[in-house]
Swiss-Prot record:
GO terms for molecular function: DNA binding. The keyword DNA-binding applies. The keyword DNA-binding applies. Required for Tn7 transposition. It may at least play a role in DNA sequence recognition. It seems to be required for specific binding to a region of att-Tn7. InterPro entries: TniQ, TnsD_C. It comes from the Bacteria. This is Transposon Tn7 transposition protein TnsD. It comes from Escherichia coli.
């Protein structure tokens, strides 16, 4: 693509592509994909896009913007990279250069993370005013899209549009061509604005590019942090004291807004888990909340440097003490006691969960593990197949009624995306589950087959919508004007839509 625009400082690459479409006067999403990528199947992704090798080639004449520079300076990748380990980070970079097919989101934990982001577009009015003054146009800024943290680091709460990023899989929306809201509510949670300002350097610091501590390093970092701050008793973390320190910085209202409320009575509380052995990665937001509360004098980069500086040699484990082996008579008695408990409670698991069984199991595991494992394997109960938890027939009937209501509502509307099977399912409350189990839902499958919109029908609907719009605006009808308003071209229009166009407009 010629004259591809150069990204502005802190601009998302998504926004740069949207501006390219505006500069070239391209109104068709698929045509823009053709021009930029040479591939009509690329999905417009805001935070973690792929195919960045193509963008780097478009910007080759600038002498800048290698793939890694685009990733670290014009995507949200720096918010995930420091927390997933070096190997996974490097593999994600490789995938983002080419066709990732959603693998990057899975690899970086976005899909399974408890930190969920609102997919609606958002902006900061004060930042937009600065952009217009400096560049003469507005664009989507990276620090407006901190996942689950809709706050500008400089000016506070962001303004949301009704339109979401995934409303159209292939559409790149430009901020400069979006009507800005004049009336919007103000949020007064200054704690979250301060948190956004604390996190923002993570997006811009070149030093952070090589900082990806391992899970072992994170484990040791938090253990030492608790010890240094006196938040331990003997060798145990005082989770109540940790929670108290976090609450001194962040109110329950702020934590609930981030969906990170502290459930101290639950063993699965995220704040407890982050101070235990790390078996999985935690999000940038969880780390940042702890650091800002417990390490207020350190920047986010300095905290990362401290964790990265911990070497494997400094991670030591205590050797297990060698106990005196019991005599055979003691072992025989313990064996008999365990066998009686298993028969009494009618199962190994139930026996272990009893008060005396837990102690006895631990003793045997320590002193005669081979016998315990061998005997338990011989006396395992056959696990009965669980009863089906879902009545698929009932769900099929409920879902098909929901779909029919949606389809009926769409009949009176011309202004909606193409009603494909996947789009229709997304409009239902549990569309993802329905899509994965479609083979168990014959009524839903039949409904989708009958009512999903073909390409021809979709083009005819767009022509109808364009015709009505031009008539209402009292604009002279021309074939090219109808096609342009319907975002169609002579090359892409189907035969059926072409016949409909001739019927509406007539031969030129």
């Amino acid at each position: 693509m010629r004259n591809f625009p150069v990204p502005y400082s802190n601009e998302l690459i998504y926004s740069t592509i949207a501006r390219a479409g505006v500069y070239q006067g391209i109104v068709s999403p698929k045509q823009l994909l053709d021009e930029v990528y040479g591939n009509r199947k690329v999905v417009a992704t805001l935070g973690l896009p792929s195919h960045l090798g193509v963008i780097a080639r478009h910007l080759h004449q600038t002498g800048r913007y290698a793939v890694q520079q685009l990733i670290y300076e014009h995507t949200l990748f720096p918010l995930y990279a420091p927390f997933v380990g070096k190997e996974r980070r490097d593999e994600a970079i490789r995938l983002m250069e080419y066709q990732a097919q959603g693998a990057v989101h899975l690899m970086l934990g976005v899909a399974a993370s408890r930190v969920k982001s609102d997919n609606r577009f958002r902006y900061c009015p004060d930042c937009v005013a600065l952009q217009l003054n400096r560049y003469g146009e507005a664009f989507w800024q990276r620090d407006w899209y901190l996942p689950a943290l809709p706050y500008c680091p400089k000016h506070g709460a962001l303004v949301f549009f009704d339109r979401a990023v995934d409303d159209h899989r292939h559409q790149f929306w430009a901020l400069g061509h979006t009507e800005l809201l004049s009336d919007y509510p103000k949020d007064s949670l200054s704690q979250l604005t301060a948190l956004a300002a604390y996190i923002a350097p993570l997006l811009d610091a070149p030093r952070a590019q090589e900082l990806s501590p391992s899970l072992e390093q994170w484990t040791l970092f938090y253990q030492r942090l608790a010890q240094d701050l006196g938040l331990t008793k003997s060798k145990h973390i005082r989770h109540d004291l940790v929670a108290e320190r976090v609450r001194q910085t962040f109110s329950d209202e702020a934590l609930e807004k981030l969906d990170l409320k502290l459930a101290e009575n639950k063993d699965t509380c995220w704040l407890k888990s982050i101070f235990r052995k790390h078996r999985k990665a935690f999000s940038y937001l969880q780390h940042s909340i702890v650091w800002q509360a417990l390490l207020p004098k350190l920047t986010v980069i300095e905290a990362l440097q401290q964790a990265s500086a911990l070497t494997e040699h400094s991670i030591t484990t205590r050797p297990v003490s060698q106990s005196v082996q019991p005599n055979s008579e003691d072992l025989s008695v313990k064996h008999k006691d365990w066998q009686q408990l298993v028969h009494k409670y009618q199962g190994i698991k139930a026996a272990r969960q009893s008060l005396e069984g837990g102690v006895l199991y631990a003793w045997l595991y320590r002193h005669d593990r081979d016998w315990l494992v061998h005997w338990n394997q011989q006396h395992q109960q056959e696990r009965l197949a669980p009863a089906p938890r879902v009545d698929w027939n009932q769900r099929d009937r409920i879902a098909v009624r929901q779909l029919l209501r949606i389809i009926k509502r769409l009949d009176s509307s011309l202004d909606h995306p193409r009603a494909t099977s996947s789009w229709l399912l997304k409009q239902t409350p549990n569309g993802t589950s329905l899509a994965k189990n479609l083979q168990k839902l014959p009524l839903v499958a039949l409904c989708l087959k009958r009512y999903s919109e073909s390409v021809e029908d979709y083009q005819i609907r767009r022509i109808s919508q364009a015709f009505i719009k031009l008539k209402q605006e009292d604009v002279e009808l021309r074939r090219w004007r109808l096609l342009r308003s319907a975002t169609l071209s002579k090359e892409r229009i189907t035969e059926e839509a072409q016949r409909f166009l001739e019927m509406v407009y007539g031969e030129e």
